[in-house]
């Protein structure tokens, strides 16, 4: 949303940026390029074209700093946005309208449209940093980083960017494989808590009770390290079964 401004609103996003960022740093106002949401609607198309031309005339974008919406929208590029999209006006509907409502007293105050950069504009930046905080972003962060690249999840396009970074806290990272199922991607330091988590996961995956798990189950699902540590599936099964039993009683 760095270069987005709500159309027809006195509470433009650029005003928030001015107060919270631009007024706090040493930056020449002539070097700030924000869409003007107060322009007449019939001027928006030409403005968007000129905005893209301005980006090119100054040598392109060095770095884009982005957030991500709970529905995977980047800026206001929602599901279904094509990779060729550029700066334009979009209508605010559904989830994107709820995202915009955070800027206003209520959802009823949110205007109908917004000017936003497009996916192509973002992908042409030399570097992109995507940030997300909190457990409510965990699911969409996992889809963004590890899911299939799809226009249904616009943020997933960043998988194909040559210099993109995702900066998140542990809560937002919770659904990533290296956090939720680290044994699938790396060697682990196996403590009792991690072993229990892995075995419960394996039981759910194979639809078997703990004591029915076999060496093959462990080997085929990334848990061969536990066989090496404990000698057999039987030994791991008994250990975890007893641990859980003692915890319950």
Where are these regions (language model features)?
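Conserved phosphate- and dinucleotide-binding cores of soluble alpha/beta proteins
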Residues: 10, 15-248
């Amino acid at each position: 949303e760095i270069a987005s401004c709500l159309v027809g609103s006195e509470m433009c996003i650029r005003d928030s940026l001015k107060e919270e960022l631009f007024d706090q740093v040493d930056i020449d106002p002539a070097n700030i390029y924000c869409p003007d949401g107060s322009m007449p609607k019939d001027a928006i198309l030409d403005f968007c074209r000129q905005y893209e031309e301005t980006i090119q005339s100054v040598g392109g974008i060095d770095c884009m700093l982005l957030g991500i919406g709970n529905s995977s929208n980047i800026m206001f590029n929602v599901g279904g946005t094509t990779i060729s999209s550029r700066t334009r006006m979009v209508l605010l509907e559904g989830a994107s309208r709820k995202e915009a409502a955070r800027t206003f007293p209520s959802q009823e105050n949110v205007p109908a449209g917004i000017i936003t950069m497009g996916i192509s504009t973002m992908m042409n930046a030399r570097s992109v940093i995507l940030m997300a905080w909190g457990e409510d972003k965990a699911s969409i962060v996992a889809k963004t980083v590890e899911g299939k690249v799809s226009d249904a999840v616009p943020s997933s396009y960043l998988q194909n960017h040559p210099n993109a970074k995702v900066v998140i806290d542990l809560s937002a990272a919770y659904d990533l494989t290296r956090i939720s199922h680290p044994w699938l991607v790396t060697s682990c330091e196996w403590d009792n808590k991690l072993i229990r988590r892995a075995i419960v996961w394996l039981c759910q995956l194979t639809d078997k009770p703990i004591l029915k798990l076999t060496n093959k189950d462990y080997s085929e699902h990334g848990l061969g390290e536990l066989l090496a540590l404990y000698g057999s599936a039987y030994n791991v099964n008994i250990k975890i079964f007893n641990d859980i039993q003692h915890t319950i009683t």
